[in-house]
Amino acid sequence: MMPDIRIRDAAAEDAGVIVLLNDAAVQHTSAMNAMRLQELQTMANCNWVITVDGAVAGFLLAMRERAGYANPNYDFFTARYTVFLYVDRIVIAPEHAGLKLGTRLYEALFEHAHAQGVPVLTCEYNIEPPNEPSRRFHDRFGFSEIGTQLLDSGKKRVSLQAAPVRQ
């Protein structure tokens, strides 16, 4: 039987699971405790979870321009685009690999951006150390590199990516 997969707005009771999922993927994203999650959620245009048979299996946080987000990657896109949707993080529980949950979230995100008249989606992923699964995933959605920058006192380099939203 096919699992019941749904995307919905994150609820307060999802916070614990979201923080645990983020902690498990922290080498590819940035640390986030419950307080930081709440701060990000207040700035988010998309604060979604994806569920499998009712259980949270992943999440996505994305911010629009002028969200007031103090982040060097977000600032990079703010300097280049007047209207955009920035993916701060997308995390899927490894035990749900193969269900295409990330693909479902991004398909919904592109539809959402289109409905809001947003012309471009932006994000970044690590290239030092490399995050090859993220690179391959974003390539499939038409993202291309528009810059790179060093973070964490030179310990990490990210590829800053943008993809057009078909209007």
Predicted feature residues:
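Active-site rim helix/loop that mediates acceptor-substrate recognition in acyltransferases
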Residues: 27-53
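Conserved acyl-donor/pantetheine-binding loop and adjacent beta-alpha core of acyl/acetyltransferases
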Residues: 61-89
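Conserved active-site alpha-helix within GNAT-family acetyltransferase domains
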Residues: 127-147
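C-terminal "cap" of GNAT-fold acetyltransferases
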Residues: 148-167
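Conserved acetyl-CoA-binding loop-helix of GNAT-fold acetyltransferases
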Residues: 92, 98-111, 140
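Glycine-rich phosphate/pyrophosphate-binding loop shared by adenosine-nucleotide-utilizing enzymes
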Residues: 5, 55-59, 85
